[in-house]
């Protein structure tokens, strides 16, 4: 995706980026590629691919969620900062927290945030299972984001405990999302969540299937969830 198309497609969706914001995306791209030579951040390094499959894809969450009405966001397993850093660039008032299990990635994100001049960001090197059991984070966030981290029954156990009651968990998925959603029904019931939207669309240019699944946190998650590190993945809730 060329930068001009990136800008135009966002404008069509009602998001008009300033030159300063476009410059931030350019800096993000160059920093990502530079650091990727030292550590494995992404398999996608060509400029058009990064703009489409990382930047634009991350921002599709805003096509279905009004981020101007969200104060606090936590991104679980953000890797190289997707989707939360692109969203932070477009919605600078967001207070963004990122948790990732790899310390090197957190180092990259701290450097990136500083050089982009982002305010209101926090980064934690932690497992999602232990992070969500800490009282300063548990049920403290308006919105929890995750992009293709794990299958939905597993992801729900990692993410829903972080959402406030009446908050939102947004899972960004590809093809196979409907099957994951079916498999996650039991987990969602146990964790206090309920699906309110499953938005299916096609990523432009490559025409690949995408889903933005919006789950409302209707009641407090039982304290036993998430279970100890590794257990949600080995023994998914059903």
UniProtKB/Swiss-Prot annotation:
Q: Where in the cell is it found?
A: Cytoplasm
Q: Which InterPro entries does the entry mention?
A: rRNA_ssu_MeTfrase_G (IPR003682), SAM-dependent_MTases_sf (IPR029063)
Q: Outline the segment boundaries, as ranges, of region: Disordered.
A: 216-238
Q: Which domain of life is it from?
A: Bacteria
Principal localisation: cytoplasm
Q: What are the record's GO terms for cellular component?
A: cytosol
One example GO MF annotation: rRNA (guanine-N7-)-methyltransferase activity
Q: Where does S-adenosyl-L-methionine bind?
A: 77, 82, 128-129, 147
Q: Which UniProt keywords apply?
A: Cytoplasm, Methyltransferase, rRNA processing, S-adenosyl-L-methionine, Transferase
Q: Give the enzyme's EC designation.
A: 2.1.1.-
Give the PANTHER family listed for this entry: S-ADENOSYL-L-METHIONINE-DEPENDENT METHYLTRANSFERASES SUPERFAMILY PROTEIN
Family, according to the entry, reads as follows:
Belongs to the methyltransferase superfamily. RNA methyltransferase RsmG family.
What's the stated role of this polypeptide? Specifically methylates the N7 position of guanine in position 535 of 16S rRNA.
Entry protein name = Ribosomal RNA small subunit methyltransferase G
Q: Gene name?
A: rsmG
């Amino acid at each position: 995706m060329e930068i001009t198309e990136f800008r135009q497609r966002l404008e069509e969706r009602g998001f008009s980026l300033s030159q300063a914001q476009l410059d931030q995306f350019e800096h993000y791209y160059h920093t990502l590629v530079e650091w990727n030579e030292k550590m494995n951040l992404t398999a996608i390094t060509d400029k058009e691919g990064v703009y489409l499959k990382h930047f634009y894809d991350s921002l599709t969450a805003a096509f279905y969620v009004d981020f101007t009405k969200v104060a606090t966001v936590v991104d679980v397993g953000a890797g190289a900062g997707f989707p939360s850093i692109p969203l932070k660039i477009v919605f600078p008032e967001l207070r963004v927290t990122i948790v990732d299990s790899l310390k090197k990635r957190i180092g990259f994100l701290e450097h990136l945030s500083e050089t982009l001049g982002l305010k209101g960001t926090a980064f934690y090197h932690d497992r999602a299972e232990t992070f969500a059991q800490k009282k300063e984070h548990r049920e403290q966030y308006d919105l929890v984001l995750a992009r293709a981290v794990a299958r939905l029954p597993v992801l729900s156990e990692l993410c829903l405990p972080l959402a406030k009651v009446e908050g939102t968990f947004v899972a960004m998925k590809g093809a196979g999302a409907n099957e994951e959603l079916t498999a996650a029904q039991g987990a969602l019931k146990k964790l206090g969540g309920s699906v309110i939207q499953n938005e299916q669309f096609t990523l432009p240019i490559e025409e690949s299937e995408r889903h933005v699944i919006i789950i409302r946190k209707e009641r407090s998650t039982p304290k036993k969830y998430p279970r100890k590190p590794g257990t949600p993945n080995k023994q998914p809730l059903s």
